[in-house]
């Protein structure tokens, strides 16, 4: 592609060279420099890649995009373009390179502090129940047409994002659904992408600190940018930050929640539990009337489901598809049931800190199990405060705990468990627990000692597929391991 085509829609100044320069691909990692490529110099939080421009020129790149002036004396044969913001420019250039695929699909973006992953999965399930072909991007990776790829960030860098959109389109997807993080918005990863629907789940202080957001107000402001880049905003009317977040919005609004003014309002829910189902049922009023059953527990599941329902309504999907999609939705590693016995209920969840653990156990306690049992550990080479906190919460809220490993990395599991034990003793000196350092043995123990009506939560790893010991990662898929053991012992 000619550089002139690549720069379409990007304000720039040609410093030297020609816009007729042929560009084979865009890079922003100087280690990938090679002839025919364009290197984008980015001013990052840790370093400024303008420092690598000369090295890239020496390796034969055809063009450079710069944000501030650099010494060009040693690179006379390289075309150089100057822009005001190289991250923003790279986003638009990447879209041009891949043929602006986002313009050819229905685009849905979901933002919020909590619930993004679950809500996107619910929306995907509803869309697919209606026959839509969906590509999804988020915390759990990239999914489309039966394929899965991991991603480093909730919202990938703009080049990878546009490349993924192209893959979605080429594979036959008609809809792209993604989690949109505040970092993704602030760092221009989604610049140039216009959404048909933007979804807001909720907001609480998070991602505030060095390299992230300076204040909660800044964090909220960046979240709100999504609603200046979409046609319809589907928003949680009950959240106290909704009004401030929507300041300056340019989209039409559709609301959900419990407030009487909500377009889609939940008017009471009940908890449902069997050995292979843990969820909620509720009635929706407002712009429409519908009874909904969701295969995920807790109050937040109601809100996430309302958001997905509202998206379905905005898109004009059949009620049957919305109902079926919500009823069948399962999120890997997020309160994921493993139905191996009719006697007890066992589930996997990614809860790996004090806040998420307390939230999960509060949700599960509401189902009034015979015993609430927790299998957990804490990661090595991480804050000890997390160990004390999780230990304290489990001691207070669980009837029985099984302390074990969780990615020890380069620490001894015995030392990690000792820290957890300290938190347990603080939370409840009479707490009942057992220490089983090997996680597989801990899973077997949980199954072997399960009682009728128990609810067993295996937490910390969730969707992870490995165990990290001494920096060596080996396969560890908890769902498969539990299913294999149940079959091995003839569990019913």
Where are these regions (language model features)?
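Acidic, Mg2+-coordinating active-site environments of NTP-dependent enzymes
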Residues: 9, 70-76, 171, 196-346, ...
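N-terminal leader/targeting and accessory segments in enzymes
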Residues: 1-92, 269-270, 293, 297-299, ...
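Non-catalytic positions within long, well-ordered alpha-helices that form the structural scaffold/packing
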Residues: 53-58, 169, 191, 365
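Short internal beta-strands
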Residues: 62-68, 233-237, 375-376, 399-406
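Structural beta-sheet core signal
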Residues: 136, 178, 198, 235, ...
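Phosphate-binding loop of NTP-binding sites
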Residues: 10, 89-237, 241-249, 306, ...
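Short glycine-rich anion-binding loops that position phosphate/pyrophosphate groups of nucleotides
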Residues: 44-46, 182-183, 204-207, 239-240, ...
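ATP-dependent carboxylate-amine ligase
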Residues: 1-14, 35-38, 51, 250, ...
């Amino acid at each position: 592609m000619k550089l002139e085509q690549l720069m379409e829609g990007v304000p720039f100044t040609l410093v030297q060279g020609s816009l007729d320069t042929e560009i084979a691909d865009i890079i922003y990692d100087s280690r990938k420099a090679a002839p025919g490529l364009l290197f984008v110099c980015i001013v990052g939080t840790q370093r400024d890649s303008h420092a690598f421009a000369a090295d890239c020129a020496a390796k034969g790149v055809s063009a450079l995009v710069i944000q501030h002036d650099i010494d060009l004396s040693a690179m006379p044969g390289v075309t150089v373009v100057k822009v005001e913001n190289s991250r923003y420019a790279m986003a638009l250039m990447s879209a041009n390179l891949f043929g602006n695929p986002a313009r050819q699909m229905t685009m849905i973006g979901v933002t919020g502090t909590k619930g993004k992953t679950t809500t996107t999965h619910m929306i995907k399930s509803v869309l697919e129940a209606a026959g839509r072909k969906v590509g999804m991007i988020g915390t759990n990776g990239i999914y489309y047409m039966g394929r899965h790829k991991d991603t480093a960030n909730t919202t990938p860098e703009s080049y990878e994002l546009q490349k993924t959109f192209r893959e979605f389109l080429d594979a036959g997807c008609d809809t792209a659904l993604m989690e949109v993080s505040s970092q993704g918005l602030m760092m221009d990863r989604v610049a140039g992408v216009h959404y048909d629907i933007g979804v807001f789940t909720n907001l609480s202080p998070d991602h505030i600190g060095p390299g992230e957001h300076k204040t909660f107000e800044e964090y909220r402001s960046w979240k709100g940018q999504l609603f200046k880049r979409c046609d319809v905003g589907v928003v949680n009317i009950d959240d106290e930050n909704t009004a401030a977040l929507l300041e300056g919005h340019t989209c039409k609004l559709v609301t959900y929640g419990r407030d009487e003014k909500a377009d889609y309002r939940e008017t009471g829910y009940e908890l449902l539990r069997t050995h292979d189902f843990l969820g909620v049922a509720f009635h929706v009023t407002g712009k429409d009337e519908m009874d909904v059953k969701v295969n995920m527990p807790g109050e937040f599941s109601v809100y996430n489901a309302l958001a997905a329902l509202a998206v379905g309504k905005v898109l004009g999907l059949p009620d049957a598809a919305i109902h079926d999609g919500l009823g069948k939705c399962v999120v890997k590693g997020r309160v994921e049931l493993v139905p191996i016995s009719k006697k007890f209920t066992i589930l996997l969840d990614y809860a790996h800190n004090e806040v998420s653990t307390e939230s999960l156990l509060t949700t599960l306690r509401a189902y009034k199990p015979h015993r609430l049992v927790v299998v957990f550990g804490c990661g090595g080479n991480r804050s000890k405060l997390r160990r004390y906190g999780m230990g304290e919460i489990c001691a207070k809220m669980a009837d029985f705990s099984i302390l074990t490993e969780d990615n020890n990395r380069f620490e001894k599991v015995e030392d990690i468990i000792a820290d957890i034990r300290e938190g347990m003793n603080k939370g409840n000196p009479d707490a009942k627990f057992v220490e089983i350092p090997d996680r597989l043995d801990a899973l077997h123990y949980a199954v072997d000692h399960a009682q009728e009506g128990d609810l067993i939560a295996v937490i910390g790893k969730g969707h992870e597929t490995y165990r990290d010991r001494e920096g060596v990662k080996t396969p560890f898929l908890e769902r498969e391991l539990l299913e294999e053991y149940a079959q091995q012992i003839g569990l019913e």
